[in-house]
Every structure is written in structure tokens, then in C-alpha cells.
């Protein structure tokens, strides 16, 4: 009988270890969830810790993505590597869609720098628009049990501009204030891609409602907080918006982002 190659044996060991770890962690989560609890009983049923055997990780071997990812300052990285790869691929996917790129919720500028870098590479004629209060989370309500407002205020316009300069991004504009109440008029006339990272129900749905009319057919709106266990107001906001608009479809990315796409006028 032919012996199994060592590398294949090693792979089987890793897969079995992953399966054991998954069972252990999922069991621990099921036991611990009722004990720890969650501010929202409804939300607690919608979140689950899991491991997967689908371990293909194209972002690890995408040299162009890794080049810009490694130049981003670690202190400013709010999103994980996989979520940033979602944005990277989104810029590439809308390169033939008419319209600029915008981000609501810039924080310290990491994702805005990635969007700017990618757009300069794949869609050099598009402008990048960043919207932020620079004073923390806005419009927290009873729909956001883990937020009171003002979180993530450890940023400034200067910090963001320095991050943009470090990534050699020259096509970005910053707009300061609560979007859309304070800066609605700065919304691009045509939008091919929007990234919404605002943590709360009201900020999410108001941003979607305002920019949707300017979104081109085929445009993507990436809602990073959709899968976050802390921003529990975001999924119902995104889902309500999609349910209310026949020309919107919703997808869920490997990075946990909710991706809304416009399929018709």
C-alpha cells in the first residue's frame, strides 16, 4: 500500500485540529452566551462564533494589496486585513462604473487611504470623498445598545491627512461634520462606490438614503459594521433599507461586510 506523503498527512492533521477547535469554541460560545448575555436579546441570537475549513486566503498572495496594506500605520488600522481586502476588491469591481468614491466614517484614515491608493491605480480619474465628524460616533440611540455617542474620537483631520500622505494619496477630499445633516451638499453627483463605517442605526440608514439617488447602476455600498458584534444597530438598518428599495440587493462578504448593490434606477 502506497504511503501518504508527509505534506498530505500534515494537512489532514491541521484540518482535524481545526474541526476539533471549531467544535470546542462553538460549544463554549453556546454555554457562555446565556451567562454573559447581550444588551439586545434579539441581537444576541443573530451572532455566533465559528471557525471554517474554507481557509483560502487570496489577500495573502495578492502582492499589490499587500504592498499598500504593509504601508498603512498599524495604530490607525480599525478594520482587519480581510475587511480592507473587501474594499480593495470593491474598487477594482467598480472601475467601469461611472462615479466617484466616498467614505462615511473615516476615523484615522486607514481605509480612506486604501480606497485612494486603489482608485489611483485602477480608476485614476475618480475622486475620493471622506466624511467624518472627527469628534467620534454620532446619532447613537436605543437601537445601538453598546454606544452612547462620542466613541472613537481619538482622531483629527491632521492624523488623516498624514496617513493619506504616507500612502501617496493625492485624490482625496475631507468633509467635516455629521453626514448627511452637515455635509449633504458635498455628496458626489455620481457615486460608483461608498464605504459606510459609522457604527449606529441612524447614521447608517440616513447615509444610505442620502447617497442612493446619486449611486450609478452597478454601484456598491460596503457597510463594514454589518457583521460586527458591537454595532448591532447596523444590520437592521441595512436590511430595512434593502427591503424598502426594489433596486437594491444585499450580499455578505467574507470579511463580514454587508455589500449593497444598485441593480437599476
What are these regions (language model features)?
Residues 82-86:
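N-terminal pre-P-loop "Q-motif" helix
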Amino acid at each position: 500500500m502506497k504511503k501518504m506523503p508527509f505534506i498530505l498527512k500534515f494537512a489532514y492533521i491541521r484540518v482535524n485540529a481545526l474541526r476539533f477547535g471549531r467544535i470546542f469554541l462553538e460549544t463554549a460560545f453556546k454555554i457562555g452566551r446565556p451567562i454573559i448575555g447581550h444588551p439586545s436579546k434579539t441581537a444576541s441570537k443573530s451572532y455566533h462564533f465559528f471557525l471554517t475549513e474554507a481557509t483560502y486566503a487570496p489577500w495573502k498572495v495578492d502582492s499589490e494589496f499587500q504592498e499598500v496594506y504593509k504601508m498603512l500605520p498599524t495604530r490607525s488600522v480599525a478594520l482587519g486585513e480581510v475587511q480592507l481586502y473587501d474594499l480593495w476588491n470593491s474598487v477594482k469591481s467598480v472601475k467601469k462604473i461611472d462615479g466617484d468614491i466616498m467614505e462615511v466614517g473615516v476615523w484615522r484614515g486607514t481605509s480612506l487611504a486604501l480606497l485612494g491608493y486603489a482608485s489611483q491605480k485602477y480608476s485614476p480619474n475618480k475622486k475620493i470623498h471622506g466624511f467624518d465628524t472627527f469628534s467620534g460616533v454620532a446619532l447613537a440611540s436605543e437601537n445601538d445598545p453598546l454606544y452612547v455617542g462620542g466613541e472613537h474620537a481619538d482622531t483629527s483631520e491632521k492624523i488623516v491627512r498624514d496617513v493619506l500622505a504616507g500612502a501617496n494619496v493625492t485624490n482625496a477630499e475631507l468633509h467635516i461634520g455629521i453626514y448627511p445633516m452637515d455635509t449633504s451638499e458635498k455628496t458626489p453627483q455620481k457615486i460608483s462606490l461608498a464605504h459606510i463605517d459609522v457604527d449606529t442605526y441612524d447614521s447608517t440608514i440616513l447615509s444610505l438614503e442620502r447617497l442612493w439617488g446619486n449611486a450609478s447602476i452597478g454601484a456598491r455600498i460596503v457597510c463594514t459594521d454589518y457583521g460586527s458584534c458591537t454595532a448591532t444597530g447596523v444590520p437592521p438598518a441595512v436590511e430595512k433599507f434593502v427591503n424598502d428599495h426594489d433596486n437594491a440587493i444585499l450580499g455578505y462578504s467574507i470579511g463580514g461586510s454587508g455589500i449593497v448593490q444598485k441593480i437599476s434606477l
